[in-house]
């Protein structure tokens, strides 16, 4: 009797698939970054809409903004404070990563706009500012990272269609996702990334080790990787970051190995006497 086991088919309900909390970026078949880490569990979510209503033009009886007690300094919110209903609503938001606008990437490497619209060093904070300018509900998630852009943390979740109001457009000028991406690209082009973009004026909280006397610097590119030269301050690639500081430190000079002080062996003298 053969010991080979026959394959077993398992039925999976559509509801199970719809309820899975996954991001397509984690399963990108074109992944070319061999050291891209697994995305961590969410720890901090920053709301960019603390002053106006979170869901403009959407009936208030259908969507309720997050509770005020969940917010803290700089508009930071703890995602664990959201209700299950609010989490389901946030799942309807469109996810946007900075690498979608990176001029140094091909479409296979993550770029989603045409090359003439792409920019250098795109950041999630600037994308969030663009969405706010358009009057769209937006969340900036500082800890989320695209696996092909692991050194540039941050992503944006934006709602441009009122999915809870029969898909009504929040901004009539934004008919499709492609139009939304193109408008964001124009904003990024008009607001290029500089070192000030990651400085104290950016509004992004600094890690404790960078609270005092930290000056942002451009990072050198690593051969073979598509990466920003200006990254958020909480990136592992930031110069002087405790986790990666040794990568950029110059190697110490090794002293030349001295020759051992061994006395010379005298040469044997041979005297030849001719007869």
Curated annotation (Swiss-Prot):
Give GO MF terms, alphabetically: 7S RNA binding
Single GO cellular component term: signal recognition particle, endoplasmic reticulum targeting
Alphabetized, the UniProt keywords read: Cytoplasm, Ribonucleoprotein, RNA-binding, Signal recognition particle
Where is the protein situated, by its record's location annotation? Answer: Cytoplasm
**InterPro entries noted in UniProt:** Signal_recog_particle_SRP19, SRP19-like_sf
Q: How does it assemble?
A: Fungal signal recognition particle consists of a 7S RNA molecule (scR1) and at least six protein subunits: SRP72, SRP68, SRP54, SEC65, SRP21 and SRP14.
- Protein name as annotated: Signal recognition particle SEC65 subunit
UniProt organism field: Candida albicans
């Amino acid at each position: 009797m053969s010991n080979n086991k026959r394959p077993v088919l398992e039925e999976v309900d559509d509801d199970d698939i719809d309820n899975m909390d996954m991001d397509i970026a984690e399963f990108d078949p074109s992944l070319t970054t061999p050291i891209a880490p697994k995305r961590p569990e969410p720890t901090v979510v920053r709301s960019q809409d603390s002053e106006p209503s979170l869901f403009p033009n959407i009936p208030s009886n259908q969507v309720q903004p997050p509770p005020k007690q969940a917010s803290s300094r700089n508009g930071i919110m703890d995602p664990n404070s959201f209700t299950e209903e609010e989490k389901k609503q946030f799942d309807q938001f469109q996810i946007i990563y900075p690498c979608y606008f990176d001029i140094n990437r091909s479409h296979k490497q993550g770029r989603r706009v045409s090359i003439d619209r792409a920019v250098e060093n795109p950041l999630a904070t600037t994308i969030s500012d663009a969405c706010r300018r358009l009057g769209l509900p937006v969340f900036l998630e500082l800890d989320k990272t695209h696996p092909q852009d692991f050194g540039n943390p941050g992503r944006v979740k934006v709602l441009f269609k009122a999915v809870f109001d029969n898909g009504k457009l929040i901004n009539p000028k934004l008919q499709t996702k492609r139009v939304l991406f193109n408008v964001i690209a124009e904003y990024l082009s008009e607001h290029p990334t500089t070192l000030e973009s990651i400085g104290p004026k950016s509004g992004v909280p600094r890690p404790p080790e960078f609270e005092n006397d930290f000056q942002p610097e451009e990072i050198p590119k690593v051969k073979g990787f598509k990466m920003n030269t200006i990254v958020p301050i909480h990136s592992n690639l930031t110069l002087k970051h405790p986790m990666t500081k040794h990568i950029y430190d110059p190697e110490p000079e090794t002293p030349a190995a001295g020759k051992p002080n061994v006395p010379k062996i005298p040469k044997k003298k041979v005297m030849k006497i001719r007869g």
